Amino acid sequence: MPRPIGNLETTTDSGTGSAAFLFQPAHLVPFVQAWTWQRLWQERLLKGADSGGDPPPEAVWLLQHPPCYTLGRGASEDHLLFDPEHPPAPLHRIDRGGEVTHHAPGQLVIYPVLDLHRHRTDLHWYLRQLEQVVIDVLAALGLRGERIEGLTGVWLDQCKVAAIGVGCRRWITQHGVALNVNCALEGFESVVPCGLAGRAVGCLSDWCPGLHVSEVQPLVCDALAARFGLCLEPNADAAIAEGRCW
């Protein structure tokens, strides 16, 4: 199967070179820890907007979680096929849209904390751009990703490979995309993924055997930079990523 080769050539219809730190932890990051990082950065952007000074950089995290489940703000526990008091992995109700999803190693999670005032203050546009990022990545792998009318996410051959759910406060985003690269899918059998009964879930490695997250990450960076007009600056400083210093 085709493999990642070089940079994507895509046309951005958003900002013009907005600065953004890129954090790519090499270790598995517990969900609550990553959620805390996003909220701290969101607060930083909000305070920067209120101060009237130079705007702080935006931020993007690309990482993997240990097994867990997350429920969106209004998600129904009817879509859990287990007792929520005794989940098979940690269960979190969080401040994003959407229903229940599963996270696990081998799934690349993309968390952009962006100020949509620098791009476009339109959540429908933002969700479609996140879908397009995934579609661009799949195209670089020689795969044809598809949308389904009325739903959010990206599918391959009717199998959902990317779930999308976001939170937004005063146009500052958090949460984002969960892209199944080479994760085990058994955890999805304990829920109705995204509340969509009867729809299959897949991994990119089903179409590209041997594919690893490390091969997909640079493609995601290229697509994010192109679609959102970001100047991504890799930053390995854990203190900055975790909000302990700026």
From Swiss-Prot:
CDD domains: LipB (cd16444). Substrate binds at R96, G97, G98, E99, V100, T101, H102, H103, A163, I164, G165, G176, V177, A178. Its EC number is 2.3.1.181. One of its GO terms (molecular function) is lipoyl(octanoyl) transferase activity. Residues 54-240 form the BPL/LPL catalytic domain. It catalyses: octanoyl-[ACP] + L-lysyl-[protein] = N(6)-octanoyl-L-lysyl-[protein] + holo-[ACP] + H(+). Its main location: cytoplasm. One of its GO terms (cellular component) is cytoplasm. The record marks K160 as: Lowers pKa of active site Cys. Pathway: Protein modification; protein lipoylation via endogenous pathway; protein N(6)-(lipoyl)lysine from octanoyl-[acyl-carrier-protein]: step 1/2. Pfam families: LplA-B_cat. The keyword Transferase applies. Keywords: Acyltransferase, Cytoplasm, Transferase. The active site is at C194. It is an enzyme of class 2 (transferase). GO terms for biological process: protein modification process. InterPro entries: aa-tRNA-synth_II/BPL/LPL, BPL_LPL_catalytic, Octanoyltransferase, Octanoyltransferase_CS. It is found in: Cytoplasm. Signal peptide: none annotated. In the reaction, the free carboxyl group of octanoic acid is attached via an amide linkage to the epsilon-amino group of a specific lysine residue of lipoyl domains of lipoate-dependent enzymes. Catalyzes the transfer of endogenously produced octanoic acid from octanoyl-acyl-carrier-protein onto the lipoyl domains of lipoate-dependent enzymes. Lipoyl-ACP can also act as a substrate although octanoyl-ACP is likely to be the physiological substrate. Belongs to the LipB family. This is Octanoyltransferase. It comes from Synechococcus sp. (strain WH7803).
